[in-house]
C-alpha cells in the first residue's frame, strides 16, 4: 500500500495492464475505488482492500469505479467486494446498469453525486471523454481522472466509432469540470490517473481542463 495524498492510498496495480485499486479514507470510513478483475498469479483487489481496511480499522462505506472498461470493472470483483464488505454501498454511474449483473442495492447516478466519508465530501462527476461511463472522483482536493487523456480532447479510441465519445460531449465534460470549483466552492489542486501513472501537484485545475478541451496532437 502506497500513500499518495492524505487519505488516498494506492493498494496495488492489478489485472493485465496494471489498473490501480485505491483506498480513500477519512476518520474511520473508507471507499474502495476501482473494481478490476483479478488475474491468475497477480494481486487480488478484494484481498488488497480487505487487508488495508483491517490494518487501518476502517469501515468500507462505498465501492466506486471510474468507468466500465474491462480492465477497470469486473462483475466477479464487484460481487466479491460486496460479500467482503456487506455494509458497503456500490455507487456507479447510470451507464453501469447494463454491465452490473445484480443491481439490487446499487446506487446509480446520472450527472453528479455528493457522498460523505467521515465528514469529508466525496464527489462523483459523470464526465465522458475516454469512455461513456467516465466518472471523475474528487476527494480531499484531489481528482482521479480515470483514463482521461489530459491536455487534449483527443482519445486513444478515436479510431473506433463504437468506443469513441462524440467530440462535443468531451468538450462539454471539460467545461463541466471547469465549472466545478466555482459551483461547489471547492479547490481541486491535485490530479492522478487511476493506473497510477500520472500524479500532479499544485494544479490549476480549470486551466488544465481548458487545455484538455483543445484539439492537440500529443501522440
Language model features with spans:
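Histidine-centered catalytic micro-motifs
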Residues: 63-73, 127-132, 192-197
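Active-site-proximal loop/helix segment associated with metal-binding centers of metalloenzymes
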Residues: 18, 94-95, 101-110, 135, ...
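Active-site HxH/HxHxD metal-binding segment of metal-dependent hydrolases
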Residues: 39-114, 215
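Metallo-beta-lactamase
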Residues: 30, 37-39, 121, 132-208, ...
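Short catalytic-loop micro-motif centered on adjacent basic/acidic residues
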Residues: 31-34, 63-65, 124
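Conserved beta-strand hairpin/beta-sheet module of binuclear metal-dependent hydrolase folds
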Residues: 1-51, 135-152
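Residue-level detector of beta-strand face positions
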Residues: 23, 114-116, 123, 136
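Hydrophobic/aromatic beta-strand patches that form the interior of the parallel beta-sheet core
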Residues: 9, 64, 91, 107, ...
Amino acid at each position: 500500500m502506497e500513500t499518495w495524498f492524505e487519505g488516498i492510498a494506492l493498494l496495488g496495480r492489478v489485472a493485465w495492464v496494471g489498473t490501480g485499486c485505491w483506498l480513500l479514507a477519512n476518520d474511520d470510513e473508507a471507499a474502495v475505488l476501482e473494481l478490476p478483475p483479478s488475474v491468475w498469479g497477480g494481486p487480488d483487489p478484494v484481498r488488497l482492500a480487505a487487508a488495508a481496511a483491517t490494518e487501518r480499522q476502517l469501515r468500507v462505506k462505498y465501492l466506486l469505479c471510474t468507468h466500465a472498461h474491462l480492465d477497470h470493472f469486473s462483475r466477479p470483483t464487484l460481487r466479491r467486494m460486496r460479500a467482503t464488505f456487506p455494509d458497503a454501498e456500490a455507487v456507479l454511474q447510470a451507464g453501469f446498469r447494463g454491465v452490473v449483473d445484480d443491481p439490487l442495492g446499487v446506487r446509480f447516478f446520472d450527472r453528479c453525486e455528493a457522498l460523505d466519508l467521515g465528514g469529508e465530501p466525496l464527489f462523483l462527476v459523470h464526465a465522458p471523454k475516454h469512455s461513456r461511463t467516465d466518472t471523475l472522483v474528487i476527494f480531499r482536493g484531489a481528482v482521479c481522472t480515470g483514463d482521461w487523456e489530459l491536455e487534449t480532447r483527443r482519445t486513444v479510441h478515436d479510431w473506433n466509432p463504437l468506443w469513441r465519445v462524440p467530440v462535443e460531449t468531451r468538450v462539454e465534460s471539460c467545461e463541466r469540470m471547469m465549472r466545478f470549483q466555482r459551483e461547489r466552492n471547492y479547490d481541486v489542486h491535485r490530479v492522478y490517473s487511476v493506473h497510477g501513472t500520472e500524479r500532479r501537484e499544485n494544479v490549476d485545475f480549470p486551466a488544465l481542463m481548458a487545455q484538455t478541451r483543445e484539439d492537440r496532437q500529443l501522440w
